[in-house]
Amino acid sequence: MGLTDYRALLIDCDEVLVDRDSGVLAALQPLLDSRSGQPPREQVLAEYNTVVANLYPRFAELGFSGLLCFAHRQLAERWGLHASWEEGMSFARSAGSWALFEDAPGAMLYLRKFYRLLVRGDRDAEDRGVLCERLGIAPEDFISLADDLQWLSEQAEDVHPVLHVTRPSVAAHGVLDRCLIGRQRPRQPSRCAADYCISSMADLVAQHQLSLRR
């Protein structure tokens, strides 16, 4: 399908619209400062992602802040450090201040003229409304990672066909077409492993504009 054939975009929040990795690293810096030597950025993020993935089955029990708090504590234990629950909660609350990528607001403003925009992610209730306002979407269009498949099934007639805008590290999401946003990655000459492979949300806007001219 062409870019202009979709009715809705299901856009991953973190690392597509929100610079989660930079936010996580900044919030982990006090813990990292306690280590002997600074591990590479990629290593820290890989360990963080592993811990979060292992905790995610408990999301319904822990909630978003609880999950991040436990992730902080488990990272400290991995690194042979002590971290208080207060430090863990401070880390969890930092998610409310994670920055948007520079191109995200303008891209969302443009794309909502042509699509229904659905954002896929998790946040605490008190942060969700503010984030939706920053992204220019209605609160009901911010869909939890735990509920997205059921939601899409229930809303099929209103939103399909849907293009899933995600990052390369995320597995294929059901039968949805995929657009991979490869931020901070050089363009690869190898074959694209999705329906679309682009470098940023600004690039998605540019590709859509090209499609309109064809």
Report the location of each language-model feature.
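Asp-based, Mg2+/Mn2+-dependent phosphohydrolase catalytic module
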Residues: 1-9, 109, 120-214
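Residue-level marker of alpha-helix boundaries and capping positions
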Residues: 63, 98, 119, 161-162
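Secondary-structure boundary/capping signal
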Residues: 36-40, 83, 115, 119, ...
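Glycine-centered loop/turn motif at secondary-structure junctions
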Residues: 36, 80, 114-115, 136, ...
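Substrate-recognition element of Asp-dependent hydrolases with the DxDx(T/V) motif
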Residues: 83-133, 143-145
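N-terminal helical cap/lid subdomain that shapes the substrate entry/recognition surface
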Residues: 3-102
